[in-house]
Amino acid sequence: MSRNRQIIIPDDVMETEAVVNTVAGVDCFVSLPRQLLHALQSTSSSPLPPLLPVELRSGDRRWSVAWSGSSSSSSAIEIARVFAESISLPDGTVVKVRVLPNVPKATLVTVEPETEDDWEVLELNAELAEAAILSQVRILHETMKFPLWLHDRTVIRFSVVSTFPSKGVVQLVPGTEVAVAPKRRDRNLKAKKSQEKECNNVKALLRVQETDRSAFHEADVKGFELRVALTSIAYIHPETAKKHSLESLQLISVSPRIPLKGSAKKDEALNMKNSEASKVAENGTSSAKKEPRQAILRLVFSDLAAKGHLMMVESLRLYLGAGLHSWVYLRGCNVNEDKEIPALSLSPCVFKISENEKVLDKGTDRLGNNNSVRKSSHPPSGLSTYVDVVDWSVHDKVVTALSSEGLHDEGNHDKNKKGLEYLTRLWSLAQLDAMASVTGVDVSSLIVGRETFFHFEVRGLESYKSIDGQPSVNDRWESGKKDKHTPLEILYVMTVSDESLLGDKFAGYDLSLDRSEKSDNVVHIEPVLEKMNLGEPIYLKSAKETHCNKGVSPDISSLTWMGPIVSDVIKRMTVLLSPAAGMWFSKFKIPSPGHILIYGPPGSGKTILARAAAKYFEEQKDLLAHVILVSCSTLALEKVQHIHHVLSSVIAEGLEHAPSVIILDDLDSIISSSSDTEGTQASVGVTMLTKFLTDVIDDYGEYRNSSCGIGPLAFVASVQSLEQIPQTLSSSGRFDFHVQLAAPATSERGAILKHEIQKRLLDCSEDILLNLAAKCEGYDAYDLEILVDRAVHAAIGRHLPLESNISKYNLVKEDFTRAMHDFVPVAMRDITKSASEGGRLGWEDVGGVTDIKNAIKEMIELPSKFPKIFAKSPLRLRSNVLLYGPPGCGKTHIVGAAAAACSLRFISVKGPELLNKYIGASEQAVRDIFSKAAAAAPCILFFDEFDSIAPKRGHDNTGVTDRVVNQFLTELDGVEVLTGVFVFAATSRPDLLDPALLRPGRLDRLLLCDFPSPPERLEILTVLSRKLLMADDIDLEPIALMTEGFSGADLQALLSDAQLAAVHEYLNREDKPETGTTPIITDPLLKSIASKTKPSVSETEKQKLYDIYSQFLDSRKSSREAKGKRATLA
């Protein structure tokens, strides 16, 4: 795609004369002679653009045309014969040629077919016409006529009704909205052509804005509450009205913008919109017309309306099929003032959502709640997929309640008609009062169209039964007094039965009203009510508004623990969504900035941050961004074609409702760059989706800078890590604004806890929160939310039975203590707790190795006890240890005991567990285990049998261990310090390890776990014998002297053999002791077993190990000495 270039022609260039020749052609472009092209090129400092607006002038007549790059075969200007006839340019005309500078790009162009035949041909070839218009026509102005070729032979002629901007010549660009006014065959001979032209003229194209509760009017009704929706009023900002020459209380017709099916990216969404616009008429039979609904409204000025927006009540939006933040046309309207009052019908109605063939649900939108279900054996015809029908008895209930307050004269009206008449009075009174209260002008008439929409909210109705006498399914409304916050909503449509209005789409009828008894709030509309009848129920097909639910999205102000991250995201989204920023990028040819990628571990708050930022711009009056949340994890198991369809629809919706924020939550669940799937079908799908998203973002950036009509979009994606998505997606200009959310620190955890407690309207002291935050190391935002819920459950149990006189409940330390009992954070579900593993109690569980215990205590306990002192230390602490020594000398045991003694979490990894046959999988396993340790900090990360995964590089034929060693080096002394993570490794062959791992900053502290000496063996035997039943006279010191060369594991095996021998001795005794006694290890028995047991490591093997350790230490010493010598060439 190429950007549009601007050509700069000096103003003093003289006009060139040329002759116009008409030729056979199938577009509305001209071919210029080569001499003229050379002259234009010589006056420009850059190459000619692909599209050049040109003005041809002959005397007082002017024609605006476009050149698209072709040159004529002669010295004359060549133009298609049909196009020349349309613009009345005779063949052979001598014209002066001038380039039109700075032609504005059109946002909206309204055209009309010249004849009814043209309109009918267009209806049959709508998609073909839209695809062809940009390739055939690029320059237009009001009143201009032009042809359009279909299949290179069929010609449709149009005339331009209006353009926006409306002054002078405009050019069509990708994104320009082309509205086609229908040209139907004249069935109403009395219709006035001038009025029809005025009606079809689009006065404005505005974006729909949500209203507040002021869009309802309180009605004076006894016995219950009744609120009337202002469905005959639309609110507009005064500056917007002035811009479009609109006046207060002006009568306008509003209809949704439903563009033709256009670009490939919009196809699916626009197809769905067109189907949503179709109406289901009375008795459920589908209407033959596919035109959008329209409503006749009065304009009221309000500063609450944003500029460029139109505020309408939600039910009216659903009736029109105009979703929130969509676009609507404002047109003129004809009013029949002198006609006789026609017959009117008032029909109850309900919305049917075309998105999922279900009536609108309360949880998604406020209308069409549970009163839309009834047990019925007669579903409406034409809706075979619609099983349950509206309980129309709800409408009857309200009408019956109102009948007692209706007309007080003695007539033939039944209760239903009285109630309907009074309901119509209330609706009329509410509309008039609202207009008068805002504008200060008393309006004496209401204008109704062919269909007028009524919407009422009722509260406080007594319980009722359904028609068949069974309890109603509307349980939440069975007692309105019990739930004052849940309104009962009823809808009606008033239809004008006037055949003369059928040919006039934008016609309205003037209902003159008499409010002489204003003090009594009475509106006299008897002439209208006399001709009103109760119509059949109507099912209105509508579009479900898919905007993000504000109720579950947090505010930016509540994310205090995220600090500057929030402000950075807001700044980038401001640049992406601001129209002023887009103008600067386009003006100075600056590429559009990239979009936002939030990454971090699960539960770190990625979704919360994205939703809060989106909500901020959704509520910002200058933008009112449309928010779309796509949970990609729910699409993970779907086929690629379905995911492509969903993403296409979402992007089309975002473009249609721009400015928009599109949140792609858990994007890595559908687009992941895993080496395991390389070459598989899943990999092909990932490639397709990646290419689709990159193409969309690139194309959007190009169109955004070069064309108008494309509104601003901001993509926000969340993933767990940058490595999990393809680099092409996170490169410059795409998702290049990376935001990392790490595990929260103590202060951040305290802020999260405070926010969660306040969100539940509870209290807790600051001291408790600070102490709790310090204990919740490794907890993320999700874990803390669950913890608060558990504390609330504990508090409820403490307060039971609930005391009604307490206005606000407090959480105390006891509640959180109970909540933390047996609670394991998500990141630590497979991690050993700080309590001992395998029965370890702490340092008292370790015998001997005093020097090693002291070294580990110094490394682990001191920073924990005095964190402020060590925080001021400018040097990096030595927190990595290599334990080496003969087998069975307690290397693994002492690390586990250290974790228990220091209350640290313990992550133990056996070396071979990390190795994987797939390329890159072993390195990924190393990265994952270090990430898990960082999330679980403070903790000990222990690698047993370290020599099996980190041998010297260059000795592995496969190269797997070489890459693992490289990854270890990166993790151990990377740029990011592993705060709170103590890395321990154990091996019996340190000489096999790669020397780079033992250098300073890595595993630079070496501790030898040697065979225990006699005093150490005595300590080990004492510790191991605590849980054994031994005779009182047993002496362990001789045993310690007898077991020379035994390791700690050998001593444990010795005691196990002694215990087993005691059992056999007990069973072999002839005089069995009493039942319940246990075998006892005696001193002779223990000495006997010790004299028979041999150490597991022979003297030869021991000497071999000592030689290896000596050579290992000598090699390290010689390498350090070599570093101190200066190399010379002497």
Swiss-Prot record:
GO MF terms, alphabetically ordered: ATP binding; ATP hydrolysis activity
PROSITE patterns: AAA
Any GO BP: fatty acid beta-oxidation
Induction: By wounding and avirulent pathogen infection. Systemic induction by hydrogen peroxide.
Presence of keyword Glycosyltransferase: no
Protein family according to the UniProt entry: Belongs to the AAA ATPase family.
Protein's name according to its UniProt entry: Peroxisomal ATPase PEX1
Taxonomic lineage from the root: Eukaryota, Viridiplantae, Streptophyta, Embryophyta, Tracheophyta
